[in-house]
């Protein structure tokens, strides 16, 4: 590799709004703040919920249900 053309690779501190912090390496020089990380995101914590707010599935089936039916 050529010397002096690559950005400096530094250690930076990553912090989340939940309070979890960790260190990683990057060419970014300033610290990084995240809104959601693997410690607090529902997908990773197993607290994921599937919600049908306002009956959206039923509304969709009501509008487009007839399109999927086959004539015999």
Curated annotation (Swiss-Prot):
Cited SUPFAM superfamilies: L28p-like
Coiled coil: none
Residues involved in Zn(2+) binding: 16, 18, 37, 40
Pfam families: Ribosomal_L31 (PF01197)
Presence of keyword Transport: no
Complex formation: Part of the 50S ribosomal subunit.
Chain's role: Binds the 23S rRNA.
NCBIfam families (alphabetical): L31, PRK00019.1, PRK00528.1
Protein name: Large ribosomal subunit protein bL31
Organism: Idiomarina loihiensis (strain ATCC BAA-735 / DSM 15497 / L2-TR)
């Amino acid at each position: 590799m050529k010397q002096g053309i690559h950005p400096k690779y530094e250690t930076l501190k990553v912090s989340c709004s939940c309070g979890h912090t960790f260190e990683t390496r990057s060419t970014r020089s300033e610290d990084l703040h995240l809104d959601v990380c693997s410690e607090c995101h529902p997908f990773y914590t197993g607290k994921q919920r599937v919600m049908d707010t306002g009956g959206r599935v039923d509304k969709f089936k009501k509008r487009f249900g007839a399109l999927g039916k086959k004539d015999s």
